[in-house]
Amino acid sequence: MRKIIHVDMDCFFAAVEMRDNPALRDIPIAIGGSRERRGVISTANYPARKFGVRSAMPTGMALKLCPHLTLLPGRFDAYKEASNHIREIFSRYTSRIEPLSLDEAYLDVTDSVHCHGSATLIAQEIRQTIFSELQLTASAGVAPVKFLAKIASDMNKPNGQFVITPAEVPAFLQTLPLAKIPGVGKVSAAKLEAMGLRTCGDVQKCDLVMLLKRFGKFGRILWERSQGIDERDVNSERLRKSVGVERTMAEDIHHWSECEAIIERLYPELERRLAKVKPDLLIARQGVKLKFDDFQQTTQEHVWPRLNKADLIATARKTWDERRGGRGVRLVGLHVTLLDPQMERQLVLGL
């Protein structure tokens, strides 16, 4: 049986700011773009969350909920430095680390000899070490599979941990709301509840064939998770799959010429970011994203071997003409999908 730990830093960006400026510790703060530029909140500390401020919330809405919110632009070099230090702490216990973002990761400690092989004690020691060396708190979940470890890490936040032993899995799943399973959003949860399916215990009584017919691939995943099945390994070789850049406008745009001008300004930044990870600029696909004034969004991609501005502009124009439907546009984004390493190797061998 595997021993998986999911470590999740507590309001990470905000925690770094409060550590470096203790005057911020007891007041509501958030990291995000300004209201004037129609930004969104990256994260908020717990005093701000008491007012309902949440990640991905428009800054304007956050300021309505909490007028005295202190808004910070973010210091991503500081967050990256702290993240690298945290990852180095992880590596003292195992080489099998799968970072999910700057502030969370999976660790497989099945074969670790630290703490007499106890995943519970390893998680506790990691959290204590992070606090000792960085003055930041972390929460952790321990379980035999990845999705349960992730759920567990949220059970005793902040600065806590929760353990689900193999023997406890069946009872834990019986009453676990389906909405807690990573990947089950509000819409899916509502559809499932309309079918009388609210917990994993409910799904355990369902016929797999019925779930496959109703939900396709998602139906199988739902059935497996409800049985406690998650065969995904902790992938220490997880690679970045895409690079993107986007801009939210202060005012909605309604004319193609405005959109084209924004693309002209975004393209050099996309090129710069891509060059950091792929100096030859070879890619699998490139595409554009438009978000409209009703917050609906659309993405259009085009297979293309190398970053190409003219093709991006042509793709954006086609998307603008066919999908806008007279709506104002509040966000324009450009992105590329990177080549799969195996595919890239095959292409090189083919030459």
Swiss-Prot record:
Q: Which InterPro entries match?
A: DNA/RNA_pol_sf (IPR043502), DNA_pol_Y-fam_lit_finger_sf (IPR036775), DNA_pol_Y-fam_little_finger (IPR017961), DNA_polymerase-Y (IPR050116), DNApol_IV (IPR022880), IMS_HHH_1 (IPR053848), Rev_trsase/Diguanyl_cyclase (IPR043128), UmuC (IPR001126)
Indicate where this protein resides in the cell: Cytoplasm
Q: Which UniProt keywords apply?
A: Cytoplasm, DNA damage, DNA repair, DNA replication, DNA-binding, DNA-directed DNA polymerase, Magnesium, Metal-binding, Mutator protein, Nucleotidyltransferase, Transferase
Q: A GO molecular function for this record?
A: damaged DNA binding
What is the required cofactor set for this protein?
Answer: Mg(2+)
Q: State how it assembles.
A: Monomer.
The protein's site described by Substrate discrimination is found at: 13
Biological process per Gene Ontology, one example term: SOS response
Please give the name of this protein: DNA polymerase IV
What family does this belong to?
Belongs to the DNA polymerase type-Y family.
Q: What stretches pass through the bilayer?
A: none
